Amino acid sequence: MSNQVLLDKLDRTTESLSQALAQLVKLSSIDRASADSDGDNDGTTDSITSVATNGVMMVHAHTTQLIRGVQDLLVITRAIRETWVLGQIPKKNGDEDAIDYEKCERLLEKAMDDFFGPVAL
Protein backbone atom coordinates (compact mmCIF):
# COMPACT_ATOMS: atom_id res chain seq x y z
CA MET A 1 0.00 0.00 0.00
CA SER A 2 1.16 3.50 -0.69
CA ASN A 3 1.65 6.05 2.03
CA GLN A 4 -1.39 8.08 0.94
CA VAL A 5 -3.65 5.01 1.06
CA LEU A 6 -2.40 4.19 4.56
CA LEU A 7 -2.97 7.76 5.73
CA ASP A 8 -6.49 7.85 4.27
CA LYS A 9 -7.36 4.54 5.88
CA LEU A 10 -5.90 5.76 9.18
CA ASP A 11 -8.03 8.93 9.02
CA ARG A 12 -11.20 6.98 8.27
CA THR A 13 -10.50 4.49 11.05
CA THR A 14 -9.77 7.13 13.68
CA GLU A 15 -12.92 9.04 12.69
CA SER A 16 -14.97 5.85 12.99
CA LEU A 17 -13.42 5.07 16.38
CA SER A 18 -14.11 8.54 17.73
CA GLN A 19 -17.74 8.43 16.56
CA ALA A 20 -18.31 5.00 18.09
CA LEU A 21 -16.73 6.09 21.36
CA ALA A 22 -18.83 9.27 21.44
CA GLN A 23 -21.97 7.21 20.90
CA LEU A 24 -20.97 4.85 23.72
CA VAL A 25 -20.47 7.80 26.07
CA LYS A 26 -23.83 9.24 25.03
CA LEU A 27 -25.56 5.89 25.62
CA SER A 28 -23.92 5.49 29.01
CA SER A 29 -25.56 8.68 30.24
CA ILE A 30 -29.20 7.67 29.75
CA ASP A 31 -31.64 10.08 31.39
CA ARG A 32 -32.85 8.39 34.55
CA ALA A 33 -35.66 10.89 35.17
CA SER A 34 -38.19 8.60 33.53
CA ALA A 35 -36.94 5.65 35.58
CA ASP A 36 -37.35 7.59 38.84
CA SER A 37 -40.97 8.60 38.21
CA ASP A 38 -43.53 7.73 40.87
CA GLY A 39 -45.94 6.05 38.44
CA ASP A 40 -46.40 2.36 39.11
CA ASN A 41 -48.25 1.40 35.94
CA ASP A 42 -47.11 -1.39 33.63
CA GLY A 43 -46.72 0.93 30.64
CA THR A 44 -43.85 2.78 32.31
CA THR A 45 -42.12 -0.45 33.28
CA ASP A 46 -42.47 -1.78 29.76
CA SER A 47 -41.07 1.41 28.27
CA ILE A 48 -38.13 1.39 30.70
CA THR A 49 -37.43 -2.23 29.76
CA SER A 50 -37.68 -1.36 26.08
CA VAL A 51 -35.29 1.57 26.47
CA ALA A 52 -32.84 -0.57 28.46
CA THR A 53 -32.94 -3.38 25.89
CA ASN A 54 -32.50 -0.95 23.04
CA GLY A 55 -29.61 0.68 24.91
CA VAL A 56 -27.86 -2.65 25.42
CA MET A 57 -28.21 -3.47 21.73
CA MET A 58 -26.81 -0.06 20.75
CA VAL A 59 -23.89 -0.45 23.17
CA HIS A 60 -23.16 -3.87 21.67
CA ALA A 61 -23.25 -2.46 18.12
CA HIS A 62 -20.93 0.44 18.96
CA THR A 63 -18.57 -1.84 20.90
CA THR A 64 -18.37 -4.12 17.86
CA GLN A 65 -17.60 -1.07 15.73
CA LEU A 66 -14.80 -0.12 18.15
CA ILE A 67 -13.34 -3.62 17.97
CA ARG A 68 -13.37 -3.57 14.16
CA GLY A 69 -11.70 -0.16 14.20
CA VAL A 70 -8.93 -1.37 16.49
CA GLN A 71 -8.45 -4.42 14.25
CA ASP A 72 -8.13 -2.07 11.27
CA LEU A 73 -5.50 -0.08 13.18
CA LEU A 74 -3.57 -3.29 13.81
CA VAL A 75 -3.66 -4.09 10.08
CA ILE A 76 -2.44 -0.58 9.27
CA THR A 77 0.43 -0.78 11.77
CA ARG A 78 1.43 -4.19 10.39
CA ALA A 79 1.49 -2.78 6.86
CA ILE A 80 3.61 0.15 8.05
CA ARG A 81 6.06 -2.19 9.80
CA GLU A 82 6.31 -4.45 6.73
CA THR A 83 6.93 -1.45 4.51
CA TRP A 84 9.58 -0.16 6.89
CA VAL A 85 11.36 -3.51 7.26
CA LEU A 86 11.21 -4.42 3.58
CA GLY A 87 12.37 -0.94 2.64
CA GLN A 88 15.59 -1.51 4.59
CA ILE A 89 16.55 -4.70 2.75
CA PRO A 90 18.99 -3.86 -0.03
CA LYS A 91 18.05 -5.07 -3.48
CA LYS A 92 20.52 -7.39 -5.19
CA ASN A 93 21.61 -6.98 -8.74
CA GLY A 94 21.47 -9.94 -11.11
CA ASP A 95 25.28 -9.94 -11.44
CA GLU A 96 25.79 -10.40 -7.70
CA ASP A 97 23.52 -13.45 -7.62
CA ALA A 98 26.00 -15.60 -9.57
CA ILE A 99 28.14 -17.78 -7.31
CA ASP A 100 31.83 -17.83 -8.06
CA TYR A 101 32.62 -21.49 -7.37
CA GLU A 102 36.33 -21.10 -8.09
CA LYS A 103 36.62 -18.33 -5.52
CA CYS A 104 34.71 -20.47 -2.99
CA GLU A 105 37.06 -23.41 -3.67
CA ARG A 106 40.16 -21.24 -3.15
CA LEU A 107 38.75 -19.83 0.11
CA LEU A 108 37.88 -23.33 1.34
CA GLU A 109 41.37 -24.66 0.53
CA LYS A 110 42.97 -21.68 2.27
CA ALA A 111 40.79 -22.17 5.36
CA MET A 112 41.59 -25.91 5.45
CA ASP A 113 45.32 -25.19 5.11
CA ASP A 114 45.16 -22.59 7.88
CA PHE A 115 43.23 -24.90 10.17
CA PHE A 116 44.84 -28.30 9.49
CA GLY A 117 48.09 -27.27 7.89
CA PRO A 118 49.22 -28.02 4.35
CA VAL A 119 48.29 -31.48 3.13
CA ALA A 120 50.83 -33.32 0.99
CA LEU A 121 49.41 -35.39 -1.83
Swiss-Prot record:
Example GO biological process: RNA polymerase II preinitiation complex assembly
Gene Ontology molecular function, alphabetical: transcription coregulator activity
GO CC terms: core mediator complex; mediator complex
Gene3D superfamilies to which the protein is assigned, alphabetical: Mediator of RNA polymerase II transcription subunit 22 (6.10.280.160)
Matching Pfam families: Med22
Entry keywords, A to Z: Activator, Nucleus, Transcription, Transcription regulation
Chain's role: Component of the Mediator complex, a coactivator involved in the regulated transcription of nearly all RNA polymerase II-dependent genes. Mediator functions as a bridge to convey information from gene-specific regulatory proteins to the basal RNA polymerase II transcription machinery. Mediator is recruited to promoters by direct interactions with regulatory proteins and serves as a scaffold for the assembly of a functional preinitiation complex with RNA polymerase II and the general transcription factors.
Protein family membership: Belongs to the Mediator complex subunit 22 family.
Name of protein: Mediator of RNA polymerase II transcription subunit 22
